[in-house]
Amino acid sequence: MEYLEDNKTETFEEEDKEREEDQVLDSDEVLDSNELNDMQECLSQTDLSNIDNNRAIQQLSLGSMEFPSYTTNSEKEEMLLGLADNFWHQYTHLYPDRKPLFMCPRNECGVEKFVCTTLHPTLLPYSDLYDWDQSAKFVSEYLTMEPLNPPLELPRSLFSSTSVLQKQSGNCFDFSVLLCSLLLGAGYDAYCVSGYATREMCLMDEKRNICPLLNKVEESSWEIPQKPLKKYTVKPPRQLISKFAVQQEAKKQAKMEEALRNEQEEETRLKEDAEKPGPDNLHGLRVHCWVLVLSGKREVPENFFIDALTGKSYATISEPFLGVESVWNHEDYWVNMQDCRNGCKDMKFDLGDPVCWEYLLQGGSKPLLLIPDEEDEEELNGETIQENKTIFQMPPSWVLPIVIRPKEFETRCPQGRKILQYKKAKHEKWAPYLKRDGHVSRLTGYLDTECTQEVKIQDCFQNRKDKLDLREQNKIEQVTTEYFIPGRADSLKVHEYRSLAPETERSMMFYSEARLDGLQRRDEKPVEMTEIYQGRADFLYYRHIVFGKRPKKVAIAGGPTEANPRPILKITERFNRNKEKPANEDVAERTFLLTEDRIQLRCHRKDDHITTSYWEFLKPANLGEKDTPIVLTPETCISYQVEPSEKFSKQLYVYETLVTLQQAEQNSKDNVRKSETEVREILATRAQEEADPQLTISIYDTERNEKSKEKREAMERAIQEERQRRAVQELDYLAPFLAQLGDPEKLTLWQAQKVKEDCLSDMKQRLIEKANLIQARFEKETQELQKKQQWYHQNQMSMSKEDEEAYLDYCSEAMFRIHILETRLNRHKDLAPQKYLALEDRLNKDPRLREPFLTS
């Protein structure tokens, strides 16, 4: 491509002559915020819905406001189009068998634009879009895909990202250009790629792909870790079983498992063969566009692809990508010179390698890896400086700045809803506040590929007043699991149930750190209840309750359930070790057998013991009655003491222990009844919350928060009134000069002229003094820096590394101060005449110095 290089050199000479015109043009294209908003509003009124699937070019009416960059090309752009046209002709001449390049499509106004100038690097003010994965997810959700038509040809047009965002739809090229612009603005080394891909990727067909949300490993909760076996653990008794019989049974079992495994593998293979897509007659010919991210910037470890249609990332050797024709960014354009028979597996993405990639401009960010010939080495070395001065630079983007309003960013999906179909799964998304119950996502899993039989439904919620975050429904087992974020009054964290009716099987988990009783989990069955605690002062961590059948009583219709409570048969409580008590007196487990009037105690085991102390009490019938003698028999207290003590055998100790245990039993019964009441209240509250779901609105959401909006308007009115009041009470600038004359009610013509001259003279003097002060500080800083530099040159050879670093830090700070002073001085010189003229104008308009208020 030698002719292309000659053509570049000819254009370099014309570039110097046009540089001044380009600077004027660039300065004219700088828009302030009001003009930008007007342009965006006019562009949003452009009717883009009439463009058919073939994306036929139409001369669109952009309203009364003209967009020079959209409707015309600058001289620099025309020069670039000439270079691209020359490059394209040479390429088609040298490689007639290759497909044409995607270089100069038409925009929405029917004007040819080079693809590099369509990219507009933009960093939006949203932290979510600073990372590539969130940016790709946003683009894939915000836009609706339009397939290329025909799928074998490059599109004849490429719209600006502002038009694509307004229309909220586009083809793969529109998706990739928008995503690449966002990634470039976020600091990634990103490129658009024009090439070929599989049918499923080009058509965004994910019906044979597993949903990425289903690939996440579900965290197993509440699994009791198995304790490791200790060295002196008692071994189980030896089983007198024939080893030969065991071996034969193991072989038989292995054969059965192998046969079953082979059968399952064959069944899986048949299913996969049935689910495989049919042959594609256009395989390898379907045009596609995606994004390439090279390693280096933003700590990217290796190169990877991003499919902008789905937002997924792939390795550069992935099979869905079948070939690459060209890549480009906002600085240059590269054509692939490598063989793509094996797809992208063997490709190298070193864009500075001229053997693998042919560039359009040499001014790109990628250094050129060339080995000059020996005979041309001296000539090249002599011309390096001249060539660097004449490299053609890519003109600025013709696209308006990409703007996404907060409401649009929050809505994401077109019309606030989007449906994605996967293999045996369907994913539905909604914008926040679109649905009355705060529903934002639903993932439905199916048993068959036709998606007719539901297996599992996962619903996500946002902004719920009841703090509901996620609901999972298992359709096979008929189990519903709800997850809540912190903030509920009952501190509910997880609720797993089959029915919302009380006294049925359910499991509740709580935020224990937010509860006074430290309740962490409550499992309930029709006749049982188990509670797990954490961090209690009484060391209780486990309570198990067994209920009996409710006695048949005549109940009032609609009356409360607690009028006929379930009888409590047994309460078992377990406690952690209390180091302040001896192990022989520290209760580990306490069991109340209410129907038998028996209480069982088991103490903790000491570290050097293998048994524990055990107590069993039989409550006397008249225990707790006053003025009634209590008879303690040997059956009243049965115990086994690891370390016997005399006090344990005294009847007074037994009596006091019985009284204490009776009170503890009553407290446990009261706590059980409170737990039953709390469960009923939680179920009633949940039923009411589901019947009438309420949403919360953040105080920072100015669009939806009416109270915040009214308060903000009131504050603005108060600020405006305060400004007006201060303006009225502003100090009089003539007061010092009128005081010198005795503050007369009226001035003579001579006095008025003198006051005016004195005021202007004082203003002039203060402006001069301020300029002299800034100038003196500027000269002082400059002299000190010069002295420091002279000192450095004199002592440079004997200075340590720390002294050099300190000197460099001082120079940096000094240069910063000098720059600030110079800027302030220049600004003062520019503003001083304006301030003087403004004061003179105010004096001329002051009624106290004008004719009606003057005396003769």
From Swiss-Prot:
InterPro entries: CEPT76/DRC7_peptidase-like_dom, DRC7/lobo, DRC7_C, MORN_DRC7, Papain-like_cys_pep_sf. Keywords: Cell projection, Cilium, Coiled coil, Cytoplasm, Cytoskeleton, Differentiation, Flagellum, Spermatogenesis. It holds the Pfam family DRC7_C. Its main location: other. Residues 1-30, 255-277 are annotated as: Disordered. It comes from the Eukaryota. GO terms for cellular component: cytoplasm; cytoskeleton; motile cilium. Residues 245-276, 661-733, 764-790 form a coiled coil. It is found in: Cell projection, Cilium, Flagellum; Cytoplasm, Cytoskeleton, Cilium axoneme; Cytoplasm, Cytoskeleton, Flagellum axoneme. SUPFAM superfamilies: Cysteine proteinases. Component of the nexin-dynein regulatory complex (N-DRC). Belongs to the DRC7 family. Component of the nexin-dynein regulatory complex (N-DRC) a key regulator of ciliary/flagellar motility which maintains the alignment and integrity of the distal axoneme and regulates microtubule sliding in motile axonemes. Involved in the regulation of flagellar motility. Essential for male fertility, sperm head morphogenesis and sperm flagellum formation. This is Dynein regulatory complex subunit 7. It comes from Xenopus tropicalis.
